Amino acid sequence: MRPVGLRELLSIRVDVAPIVDLGGGRRYVPFDGGTFEGRDGLAGTILRGGVDWQQVRADGVIEIDAHYALASTEREAVEVRSRGLRAASPEVAARLSRGDAVDPDEYYFRTHVRFTTSAPRLDWLNSILAVSTGRRDRDVVTIDVHEVL
């Protein structure tokens, strides 16, 4: 069996607005911008208007479905789709909800990430799978993305 490897791809820092509660465990988090930086000269901004749709399950686990766009420093657009889970003990979840600083080792925040772009320089992003680890702070989510080799 061939093992799966990972290679650092980029770090995304998303500025988030307050959560909008839709009831029944459904909610969303609007993206207000942000930045990204990574290997091979990848850098730029997070465009406003992205959203992280969430379902808070009965067991407290949050199902994540984020859809947003990046704009590179070369003005290349990249669509990002990220799905995953954030799980924490009730105590840690309460601290996160209050906006307290919480060590990311105290909770599980993982997603799989797909990219779509028509930019020739970044075409290779269309052909990779990626996974990420996340960190939630008061008004910022930091996502460290790794290419699956």
Regions found by a protein language model. Give the residues of each.
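Beta-strand-enriched cores of mature, soluble protein domains
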Residues: M1-L149
